[in-house]
Amino acid sequence: MSRLKASLDEYVALKDYLNPERDRNYIIERSGVDPRFFRWYFQNVMVQDFRVWRANLRIEEAKRIIMATPDVSMNALAMRLGFGTSQNFYHHFKKVVGQTPTEFMETCGTNRPE
């Protein structure tokens, strides 16, 4: 279990979650754990699916970027965060935060310049 935990910690520290190619198989290979154990670990220890966990990490990064760079393009941000499309990004952002990225900017007082 400690090998997997160490691999997950490294995955977060290096922001590998932003790279769409760094998926669950990448972590399984790096940690050397069995895929069934990986699934068990996320279900029972993390109490969420890997994809949900990774999307949450990406959304937290999105919030940091939006607050620091209010004029950021949502399309560019979606690609930078590994969401692929702005629609996918908006869907996950609203699901996690309860607001669209634009609403989040307005709430935080980081209005986009007109």
Model-derived features: positions:
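Short, leucine-enriched amphipathic alpha-helices that occur as contiguous helical runs
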Residues: 1-9, 55-63, 86
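Inter-domain helical "communication" segments and dimerization helices
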Residues: 1-19, 36-37, 109-114
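Basic, amphipathic alpha-helical hairpins
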Residues: 5-22, 42, 46, 63-72, ...
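Hydrophobic alpha-helical packing segments in soluble, helical-rich domains
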Residues: 7-9, 24-35
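Short alpha-helical "recognition helix" segments of helix-turn-helix
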Residues: 27-28, 38, 77-78
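HTH DNA-binding helix-turn interface
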Residues: 35, 39-53, 83-84, 93-102
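Sequence-specific DNA-binding recognition helix
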Residues: 69-105
